[in-house]
A protein has these predicted regions:
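ABC-family ATPase nucleotide-binding domain "signature/switch" substructure
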Residues: 3, 8, 16-21, 37-40, ...
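Conserved ABC ATPase "signature" region
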Residues: 32-52
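Catalytic strand-loop-helix junctions within cyclic-nucleotide turnover domains
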Residues: 27
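A short, flexible helix-to-loop-to-beta junction within the catalytic ATP-binding CA
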Residues: 24
Length: 163
């Protein structure tokens, strides 16, 4: 099973529980599972919600910050207990502080789930075990971040000054 956290998450004008259990729409929601996924996704704003997981989030999650929306996306992806969790530019729309919070959340999941992270921000992949530098569909280099990222940065720097 694969869980997916997109760059732009769509939230329903529904409760937090319904948004987390979105993949099981129409079925009975496992509230204990929703709470466990919220905990795993470091959703720390549950106590601030007037009706806990039953609080309606508003159209596209208007009552939440960008970082909170992404955490709901992570909880949603975790609800089906995936073997692999795919993050597709999941932090690109966030400011630095929110990105750091989400990075901490992602790091906490590394021990229990295989993570595949697609990102342009180098800080997003700096803690990964293996980094693949892909250009035009080809793997240019792979290895530990400490090996691949400096070479990638040097190439970016060189191409910026050769224009």
């Amino acid at each position: 099973k694969i869980g997916y956290v997109p760059q732009n998450l769509y939230l329903l004008d529904a409760s937090l529980a319904e948004n987390v259990a979105f993949s099981q729409w129409g079925k009975t929601i496992d509230e204990a599972r929703v709470k466990k996924c919220c905990q795993m996704a470091a959703i720390d704003f549950l106590a601030d919600l007037p009706e806990d997981i039953h609080t309606v989030l508003g159209e596209r999650g208007v009552r939440l910050s960008g970082g909170q929306v992404q955490r709901v996306g992570i909880a949603r992806a975790l609800y089906d207990n995936p073997d692999l969790l795919l993050f597709d530019e999941a932090t690109s729309a966030l400011d630095g502080a929110a990105e750091n919070e989400i990075q901490t959340t992602i790091s906490s999941l590394r021990s229990s789930i295989t993570l595949l992270i697609i990102a342009h921000r180098l800080s997003t992949v700096a803690e990964c075990d293996i980094v693949y530098w892909i250009d035009k569909g080809r793997i240019i280099r792979s290895g530990a971040p400490g090996e691949v990222l400096p070479e990638y940065e040097a190439t970016l720097h060189q191409s910026a000054f050769s224009r």
